[in-house]
Structure formats: C-alpha cells, structure tokens
UniProtKB/Swiss-Prot annotation:
It comes from the Eukaryota. Sequence repeats lie at residues 49-52, 55-58, 61-64, 201-204, 220-223, 239-242, 249-252, 268-271, 278-281. Restricted to hair root, not detected in any other tissues. This is Keratin-associated protein 5-4. One of its GO terms (cellular component) is intermediate filament. Signal peptide: none annotated. The gene is KRTAP5-4. Coiled coil: none annotated. Interacts with hair keratins. The lineage of its organism: Eukaryota, Metazoa, Chordata, Craniata, Vertebrata. Keywords: Keratin, Repeat. It comes from Homo sapiens (Human). Residues 49-281 are annotated as: 9 X 4 AA repeats of C-C-X-P. Belongs to the KRTAP type 5 family. The keyword DNA-binding does not apply. In the hair cortex, hair keratin intermediate filaments are embedded in an interfilamentous matrix, consisting of hair keratin-associated protein (KRTAP), which are essential for the formation of a rigid and resistant hair shaft through their extensive disulfide bond cross-linking with abundant cysteine residues of hair keratins. The matrix proteins include the high-sulfur and high-glycine-tyrosine keratins.
Length: 288
C-alpha cells in the first residue's frame, strides 16, 4: 500500500515509520489533497468510481467499496484489485466473497490481511466481520470501518474522510458519518488544537475553553485541574488519583468534610488536626 509522506513506509505495513507514519504533519505532511503520489482517481482507478483517502498510516488508496472494475491499491465491488478486496472478485493480497487469495480468505474464511463479504480476518473484515485494517459493508474494525461500524483510521461505504469514519458509526481517530477531518474532529466538525474526537495523528489535549470534567479525552492526556479550584470533579477518576488540583505533583487532599481518620489519604501527606476547625482540606496542613 502507499504511504503518505513517508519515504520508507509506515508501521508494519511499510516499516521505517512509526505508527503515526513519523515525519508527517497533522495534515498528512507532504501529501496533497489527492493523497500525495496517488492520482485524483486513487492510483489507477477512475475518478468516478474511487474515493481517495489520505492519512499518515500505510493507507493511500480508495474506500474499499468503489465500483470500478479494477484499482491499483483498493478493490471495487465486483472487480479485481491490488491490495483490497471486492465483493465477488479474486485478489492478490485480499479476498473476495467467493474467491481465494494470496493473503486473505473468501466469503466464509479468515484471512491474513483483508476479508471477504462475510468472513472475519486478521487485518481486514468483511460485511459482518471485524477487522484491523480494512472494513466491509457492515463490520466494525480496528483501522477501517464499514457502513455501520466504528473505525480507527479509514472510512466505510458511504462516509469518506481524511483519516476515518463510517457512514453511521463513530470512530476512534477521525470524523463520523457526515464530516471529514484533518487532524481531529467529530462527526460533523473539525477541531483546532483540541476537543472533538481523537485522531491518531493528533494527540489529545485540553480544551482551550478550560479544564472541565471533559477536558482530557483519554488516559493518553494528563488530567487537568479545574480552573475553579479543587472540587470533587477536578481530576478525572479514570486517569487521576485523588490529588489536589494545584499542580501535577500535588500531594493528596484532605477530606473536605473535616479532619478525621480519613482526612489525609496517604502517609505522604502531613497529618491534619483532629478537629475539623483546624484543618485546611486542600493542603492537609494544620491551622496552628
């Protein structure tokens, strides 16, 4: 498969680049709107039958359900193909619904790289099977989605986008059923430096509007403190221990209810006074 912006290829698909296809910018560095290196028709396909997708992963081809008779890198619904399979055709690297192939299976068999219309596979799924790299008409997958399935990197049967998105399903990396995306972006909207859904080419960040409960979108992003102070919802429970919201290395807070036995949450915190009137809950120090 082609790889935008990487001379040596990307990840396991074309080694030398990192999982994000290192060296690519948020806009798939070095790739033009036509998916750099691929023609407007997506490498051998006519512009009327293939939808180019461009991202910094080992993907530079057409949406797997294009209707042309043959494609350079991706398959049509009934024709042969170089790397991706169609619903009824044979293949070189991927399987069709009824035909065997070099690396993948047919309609009912598993496969190494791409799947048929009904068969699951190691890397790509069919219409009902999960997949990792390419999707079928109805199956979710790890990297490419089907018409109703979520995805991480590529698009499904109806919704194209910069990096991902199925026709009805959300995705892990980029836009949804109606919206394309650049680096981030939800189902309809793009994003700047943060917010929206998370892209593989855009590390999650805090929202410019502040650090509320939805500020950090995944465990990959260090939790932010609430700008209003150190309330109970300041740090997110899934990725933050009950620290004060004053700094990233803040010691545990005392219970706001007083200074009982549960006031200080670890031995790292100075003990509070036994009476609630002489305890400062935020920093676990005594009022003396």
């Amino acid at each position: 498969m082609g790889c935008c912006g990487c001379s040596g290829g990307c990840g396991s698909g074309c080694g030398g680049c990192g999982s994000g296809c290192g060296g690519c910018g948020s806009g798939c560095g070095g790739c033009g709107s036509g998916c750099g290196g691929c023609g407007s028709g997506c490498g051998g396909c006519g512009s009327s039958c293939c939808v180019p997708i461009c991202c910094c992963k080992p993907v530079c081809c057409c949406v797997p359900a294009c209707s042309c008779s043959s494609c350079g890198s991706c398959g049509g619904s009934k024709g042969g193909y170089g790397s991706c399979g169609g619903s009824k055709g044979g293949c070189v690297s991927c399987g069709g619904s009824k035909g065997g192939c070099g690396s993948c299976g047919g309609s009912k068999g598993g496969c190494g790289s791409c799947g048929g219309s009904k068969g699951g596979c190691g890397s790509c799924g069919g219409s009902k099977g999960g997949c990792v790299s390419c999707g079928g008409s109805k199956g979710g997958c790890g990297s490419c989605g089907g018409s109703k399935g979520g995805c991480v990197s590529c698009g499904g049967s109806k919704g194209g986008c910069g990096s991902c998105g199925g026709s009805k399903g959300g995705c892990g990396s980029c836009g949804g059923s109606k919206g394309g995306c650049g680096s981030c972006g939800g189902s309809k909207g793009g994003c700047g430096s943060c917010g929206c859904s998370q892209c593989s080419c855009c590390k999650p960040c805090c929202c410019s509007s502040g650090c509320g409960s939805s500020c950090c979108q995944s465990s990959c992003c260090k939790p932010c403190c609430s700008s209003s102070g150190c309330g109970s919802s300041c740090c997110q429970s899934s990725c933050c221990k009950p620290y004060c919201c004053q700094s990233s290395c803040c010691k545990p807070c005392c219970s706001s209810s007083g200074c009982g036995s549960s006031c200080c949450q670890s031995s790292c915190c100075n003990p509070c006074c036994s009476q609630s009137s002489c305890c400062v809950p935020v920093c676990c120090q005594c009022k003396i």
